[in-house]
UniProtKB/Swiss-Prot annotation:
The protein's enzyme class: transferase
Assembly with partners or alone: Homotrimer.
Xref: InterPro entries: Acetyltransf_C, Acetyltransf_C_sf, Hexapep, Hexapep_transf_CS, Lipid_A_LpxA, Trimer_LpxA-like_sf
PANTHER family for this protein: ACYL-[ACYL-CARRIER-PROTEIN]--UDP-N-ACETYLGLUCOSAMINE O-ACYLTRANSFERASE, ACYL-[ACYL-CARRIER-PROTEIN]--UDP-N-ACETYLGLUCOSAMINE O-ACYLTRANSFERASE, MITOCHONDRIAL-RELATED
Name the UniProt record assigns to this protein: Acyl-[acyl-carrier-protein]--UDP-N-acetylglucosamine O-acyltransferase
């Protein structure tokens, strides 16, 4: 169904069964598949392909040659009706690719809201990207990667499958991330190693001086105390009782399966 207030360019192809919301704009030479839902106010500039069982929310801007919901590159994929879900107010720039999930990975590739995906970024099957994240030009997420809120992935950086990038992380450009990056950390290199706390980013987002100090103390326990992670976990949990921002570390430890960058 195409809402009567939506605009569809005469050269675009919207297949029967697709849903186009109010005030959406489907530009020249775009292709929208039969199981696609485009939300209110979302704009497909031109030459955009949206395929598969894909749901895109409101007020997104999707630029030319982006491909969303296409068959993933997992060799086990056998055509199952897996999905892509994208939230609201994202800017998805030229030639970005976002692939549908796999049955083995839960069947869903999910992108939240208010993200900037720069030119040529790739989000593989079963990835989860939170809110207000930035993937710079040519950043690549392998399958099953999780990127938490406010994380920034630098240009030409590759993240290994199943890795977790914590909230407020800054990964420098041209890096290779092979293990999990705890929240608030700056990471750089191939393989990526930690370079302290992203204090400038936290200041910009309104973290108090006391909270930043507590986060830095937790970082020092993990990386500079000479103790094992199991040894510092109780100390970090105790610190989190006073400073709720530190709880992001304890929650992260519970999710981590690949070990932390060192």
């Amino acid at each position: 169904m195409i809402d009567k207030s939506a605009f569809v360019h005469p050269t675009a192809i919207v297949e029967e069964g697709a849903s186009i919301g109010a005030n959406a704009h489907i530009g020249p030479f775009c292709i929208v598949g039969p199981h696609v839902e485009i939300g209110e106010g979302t704009v497909l500039k031109s030459h955009v392909v949206v395929n598969g069982h894909t749901k895109i929310g409101r007020d997104n801007e999707i630029y030319q040659f982006a491909s969303i919901g296409e068959v993933n590159q997992d060799l086990k994929y056998a055509g199952e009706p897996t999905r892509v879900e994208i939230g609201d107010r994202n800017r998805i720039r030229e030639s970005v690719t976002i692939h549908r999930g796999t049955v083995q990975g839960g069947g869903l590739t999910k992108v939240g809201s208010d993200n900037l995906l720069m030119i040529n970024a790739h989000i593989a099957h079963d990835c989860t990207v939170g809110n207000r994240c930035i993937l710079a030009n040519n950043a690549t997420l392998a399958g099953h990667v999780s990127v938490d809120d406010f994380a920034i992935i630098g240009g030409m950086t590759a993240v290994h499958q199943f890795c977790i990038i914590g909230a407020h992380v800054m990964v420098g450009g041209c890096s290779g991330v092979a293990q999990d990056v705890p929240p608030y950390v700056i990471a750089q290199g191939n393989h990526a190693t930690p370079f302290g706390v992203n204090t400038e980013g936290l200041k910009r987002r309104g973290f108090s001086r006391e909270a930043i100090t507590a986060i830095r103390n937790a970082y020092k326990l993990i990386y500079r105390s000479g103790k094992t992670l199991d040894e510092v976990k109780p100390e970090i949990a105790e610190l989190a009782e006073t400073y709720p921002e530190v709880k992001a570390f304890t929650d992260f430890f519970a999710r981590s399966t690949r070990g932390l960058i060192r």
